[in-house]
């Protein structure tokens, strides 16, 4: 496995199933899988920061990122590759040291350039072909956690070490 120094993720279609709910007053709702919070835990446990890159700009994503202590949040991103390159420059790392999980067309350029690329099983086939790591879960089913655990090689010994 490559030495990863940053984990980046999309939100819709990864942390969620891609569905969006609106109430009668226009409020947007998203359903997050709480299992994905363990992905943040494991990354931080190994000293690796996590960043969100999403094309949407919503208060609910900001609140979720804040609650989980996500290190970097970029909303309303049009060009995810450029945003990731800028962050890498700030951190003094290169894209080969980044693991990224995304699920659709606006993720493709970045998926092609990072050290480890993950794609949920629910993504279109032409996006899944960009994945360098096999993921079984679909978006909204804890795929971010699965991705982080595979990228970092989390195993039973790691789990036992944190519960003792």
From Swiss-Prot:
Recorded superkingdom: Bacteria
Cofactor(s) the protein needs: Mg(2+)
EC number in record: 3.1.3.103
Annotated residues for binding of Mg(2+): 10, 12, 103
CDD domains assigned: HAD_KDO-like
Residues the record lists as binding substrate: 34, 54-56, 64-67, 80, 106
UniProt keywords, alphabetically: Hydrolase, Magnesium, Metal-binding
InterPro entries assigned: CMP-NeuNAc_synthase, HAD-like_sf, HAD-SF_hydro_IIIA, HAD_sf, KdsC_fam
CC cofactor note: Binds 1 magnesium ion per subunit.
GO MF term list: hydrolase activity, acting on ester bonds; metal ion binding
Consequence recorded when altering residue 37 to A: 2-fold decrease of the affinity for 2-keto-3-deoxy-D-glycero-D-galacto-9-phosphonononic acid (KDN-9-P)
Catalytic activity: 3-deoxy-D-glycero-beta-D-galacto-non-2-ulopyranosonate 9-phosphate + H2O = 3-deoxy-D-glycero-beta-D-galacto-non-2-ulopyranosonate + phosphate
Record bears the keyword Metal-binding: yes
Assigned protein family: Belongs to the KdsC family.
Oligomeric form and interacting partners: Homotetramer.
NCBIfam families assigned to the protein according to its UniProt record, in alphabetical order: HAD-SF-IIIA, KdsC-phosphatas
Function: Involved in the biosynthesis of 2-keto-3-deoxy-D-glycero-D-galacto-nononic acid used in cell-wall polysaccharides. Catalyzes the hydrolysis of 2-keto-3-deoxy-D-glycero-D-galacto-9-phosphonononic acid (KDN-9-P) to yield 2-keto-3-deoxy-D-glycero-D-galacto-nononic acid (KDN). Also able to hydrolyze N-acetylneuraminate-9-phosphate (Neu5NAc-9-P), 2-keto-3-deoxy-D-manno-octulosonate-8-phosphate (KDO-8-P), phosphoenolpyruvate (PEP), gluconate 6-phosphate, tyrosine phosphate ester and glucose-6-P as substrate.
Name recorded for this polypeptide: 2-keto-3-deoxy-D-glycero-D-galacto-9-phosphonononic acid phosphatase
Organism: Bacteroides thetaiotaomicron (strain ATCC 29148 / DSM 2079 / JCM 5827 / CCUG 10774 / NCTC 10582 / VPI-5482 / E50)
